[in-house]
Amino acid sequence: SLSHRFAQNGLAPEFAFKIWSPFLEQLDSHVVEMWKAGQWKDFCGMLPEYASKGHGEGFMHDTAMMLGALGWSEYDGKADIVTPYFGASGTGQINAVFPVTPVTGRDIPKAVASGADGYTPVSRRI
């Protein structure tokens, strides 16, 4: 899942195969191009804001976990797009393969969501 703004009640049939807004569709399109080009440092830097403003499902936790497993901004692979971007109930969807490449793990951020050292904003927990 990319942007995840579901169609409001009563509008679901109209948005069964559409994206909720042109803005989100353009945002997602740019993100897919970043993935295809392997621009992970830039993408990881914008992920918290993308998750918020793009209505990311679960604050893009699935994407964050996948990138953590791949090496975060150190990852140098390029996404192989399996199916073109498509809309489903207002949300942006895609199927892509992210090849595993060797990394050191040096760029993976420390987990802070479970830390008891004090408050941190949600945007810093990814």
Go through each PLM region and give its residues.
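Catalytic metal-binding/acid-base residues of hydrolase active sites
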Residues: 3
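Flexible, D/E/H-enriched segments
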Residues: 9-126
